[in-house]
Amino acid sequence: MAQEDIFKKIVSHCKEYGFVFPSSDIYDGLGAVYDYGQMGVELKNNIKEYWWKSMVLLHENIVGVDSAIFMHPTIWKASGHVDAFNDPLIDNKDSKKRYRADVLIEDQIAKYEEKINKEIAKAQKRFGEAFDEAQFRATNGRVLEIQAKMEALHTRFATALNDGNLEELRQIIIDEEIVCPISGTKNWTEVRQFNLMFSTEMGSTADGAMKVYLRPETAQGIFVNYLNVQKTGRMKIPFGIAQIGKAFRNEIVARQFIFRMREFEQMEMQFFVRPGTELEWFKTWKETRLKWHKALGFGDDHYRYHDHEKLAHYANAATDIEFLMPFGFKEVEGIHSRTDFDLSQHEKYSGKNIKYFDPELNENYVPYVIETSIGVDRMFLSIMSASYVEEALENGETRVVLKLPAALAPVKLAVMPLVKKDGLPEKAREIIDGLKFHFNCQYDEKDSIGKRYRRQDAIGTPYCITVDHQTLEDECVTLRNRDTMEQTRVRITELQSIIADKVSITALLKTLQL
């Protein structure tokens, strides 16, 4: 099945089973804004719990904050967002559609990669097991020609972006003969910058109102609270501050479902270190964060690093952890060595001394910062994408199952009476009453047991319990495993300990300590 078709099925599945809905759905929705349904909010909360505990619970020198969405507008001047938080936009005069110029060029680069992959696929089919991909890439004339064009475009594109050369971006689009996906024409306007921050006014009257912004990132809320946390918590460097919160960006080209939205949630940790040690800490956090992702069990081939060749002016190292989505490898987390840029800027603009006194060195300095930043919604999408499986069964049927990591599953356990009589529903309710304090449980008595299993498979429930007539005699139930569909008889008194070992966040966190 084509990856595009799989992605469409995942989007449809999210709506059908209560994971994600278009926001304001009864009013035909609002572009690039989504709501999380009853299953989605549970999965999302479990993702956040896994991250929060891995940061704050497992590290004595990391604490949390929850900063306000509205902050003093000068903060965004200091951070550079007012002057430089822009996207290069271009319009097609025929379709009247607006695009990000950089995205159009990135898509063109991706088309070159696609051409190379098609050449490789044809050669693989022709030569079979004897095919040597590395040799083919290095010697095939057609591949080398496409590769040269792609590299030349990439170099030209990177230079234009780095220099902020809008005329060159437009010229690249013209030279590459990039067409509008809607009109199919090359009738483009000039490229211009568009600031991504949402603004509003705070105050009771128009004359006295202050222009404020919906924060475009959560990091600045950590930086301006760094000194408060350090002093009240008696924190010694190195230490970190973690935060989970909403951020807002007026994305013109918001696409790929919840991958790029205008309202989204971030999980960020800023780690404050002694200048000169930042690259060592960058390497440590780079490895630590990849291990956190891989602990979910989707396989090493789903992840890769993308080290930044071109760095922001304030950074001296940066990498992305990319995940294999249905539409290719995409960033889910960024790790950046931000030097002392943010804190120095806030010291300059606020006029306050925010230097740290290091008792070991007996000197004051502005700490350097290592940042780890995840988009919760992107993480959610990566997990859904990797978990969605259409599985052919021996009887010729196909079941749709979400093979979610058990610790993150919205519902951990479904309890089902075999029939709706003979005291079985009452017994099932009794079992749920004993387990609901430990797990998110669901009771289901409608339809055949097979259909009920399929419903639970579709929302990713790791275990199902069936209460039958024998249960009333021996106090045992049938425990069904979602992934293997194996069924075993288990004593009711042993259910909690058996299931807890498989589905708890604690069990997942312990794998990070190995």
Q: What are the language-model segments listed below?
A:
Residues 1-514:
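NTP/phosphate- and nucleic-acid-binding module
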